[in-house]
């Protein structure tokens, strides 16, 4: 199971492209509203989340996904439940996936020390201890980062590759007619 944490001001495609890809692959994914079930994205799109952040469990958790966007990233970072699940995922070597501005949250928690990572331009200084990459998506151990909305599908396919393997991910890519 993956939790995709959504806070008001999140970048819609960065959250929903990975959800779509993982669900097509029959991977359990729950969208989690930070502060309620209905969350408004940075472009005014309202999303009714599967659950809120009050009744979550770590049972069966495979990883977490943190979309970027502003002020969504700031809202994620200040939420204690999001922080708890980042810590749990890090301690248990689960996948921690962050895109756009959201890798800054991982940098602030010193989770990128000695890792290679990418982010939206302008947030590089927040990736404390990381070796910066210009690549759209970077996977280093249990951490997957991506640089923005234009990489949302590649981000989703990289998460899928980490869970079910590259061949499985490539086959779904072909089925979806994605490069």
Specify the residue positions occupied by each region the protein language model found.
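Extended, subdomain-level signal for the structured scaffold at the beginning of enzyme domains
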Residues: 1-92, 104-109, 126-134, 145-179
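Short, thiol/selenol-centered motifs that function as redox-active sites or metal-ligating centers
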Residues: 99-100
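Conserved hydrolase catalytic core segment
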Residues: 111-113
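Beta-strand-turn-beta hairpins that frame and shape the catalytic cleft
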Residues: 138-143
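Long, charge-patterned amphipathic alpha-helical coiled-coil/hairpin "stalk" segments used as oligomerization
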Residues: 121-123
